[in-house]
Amino acid sequence: EEMENDSAKAVVTAYTVNRQKTSAEGSYTIYSLSDEKPEKDMFGADRYKINKLVTVGTFITGYEISPAVFRELPAGRYRLEVKSTDSNGKEVSANQDFILYNRQDKRPPVFMHTWLVNEHTTCAPGEEAAFIFGTSDKDTHILYEIYTADNKCTERKLIRLSDENRT
């Protein structure tokens, strides 16, 4: 998941084994992750290595983790790990990887062949679309096309990018 660091939000939700919402309190840890080629977990999903611990705190389900926590972090790949205790006193944990970016970044926040942030892509006639497109690759040629709702191409352009973002 990608989040802009100025507006990033996280709310922890807990469920029982029967998938019923429950309340919980616990701790969270945020780690920065390595940009190296990831390993695969047992389900085949990418699993990035932890680079270092960057912050810790506490949470109560249903309440936001302070947005200031995310604003203070530089653009990059992170893992949020939450821990709590269930009704039987057993420790439970979950984690979620995410990417923080800043709209003013000159290049993608992590190595990516295709970096796309949709800011405003469904528009009324005369309204401007806004998105950020980038690549970590060097000397790339990108063909972009803009279509109307009835599939008519209104613009086609070839642009060159080299480890950069464009708005």
For the regions a protein language model found, what residue spans apply to each?
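C-terminal segments of large proteins
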Residues: 1-167
